[in-house]
């Protein structure tokens, strides 16, 4: 999952929480790249099946998917001439980030990506 915000106040709140990256406030767009461990469970439940890999495998797959999405977002932004700054520090402030972006249970931030 990717949450996109152009809300300067929300972007500033992320920068303030991190405290060591003030340049984040200058980004016109912030992507929050998330892992989603709900999706497999929801699909299985929809089809009336047990989620056979409901283990650390689910977490690892969600994390890897998010990392791939982050990498491809960086490449796409570069192709468009946009600068990027990946922000792993969002994981150091989980409660704030989850609240600020209204993340549902089972969705967790992997990294932010400042674009501009």
Model-predicted regions and their roles:
Residues 1-34, 40:
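N-terminal amphipathic, basic helical "cap/leader" segment at the start of enzyme domains
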Residues 41-50:
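Short, flexible, mixed-charge acidic loops at enzyme active sites
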Residues 22-33, 101-116:
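A glycine-rich helix N-cap at a beta->alpha junction
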Residues 20, 39-40, 75-83, 103-106:
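Alpha-helix capping at helix-to-loop junctions
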Residues 8, 37, 90-94:
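Acidic, glycine-rich active-site loops and adjacent beta-strand->loop/helix elements
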Residues 31, 54-100, 113:
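Small-aliphatic-rich amphipathic alpha-helix that forms the alpha element of a beta-alpha
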Residues 25-26, 51-55:
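A charged helix-plus-loop insertion that forms the helical arch/lid used to bind
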């Amino acid at each position: 999952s990717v949450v996109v915000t152009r809300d300067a106040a929300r972007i500033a709140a992320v920068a303030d929480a991190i405290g060591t990256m003030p340049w984040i406030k200058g980004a016109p767009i912030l992507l929050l790249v998330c892992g989603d461990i709900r999706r497999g469970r929801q699909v299985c439940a929809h089809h009336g099946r047990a989620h056979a890999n409901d283990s650390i495998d689910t977490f690892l797959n969600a994390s890897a998917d998010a990392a791939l999405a982050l990498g491809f977002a960086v490449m796409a932004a570069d192709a468009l001439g946009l600068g990027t700054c990946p922000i792993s520090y969002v994981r150091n402030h989980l409660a704030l980030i989850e609240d600020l972006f209204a993340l549902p249970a089972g969705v967790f931030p992997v990294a932010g990506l400042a674009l501009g």
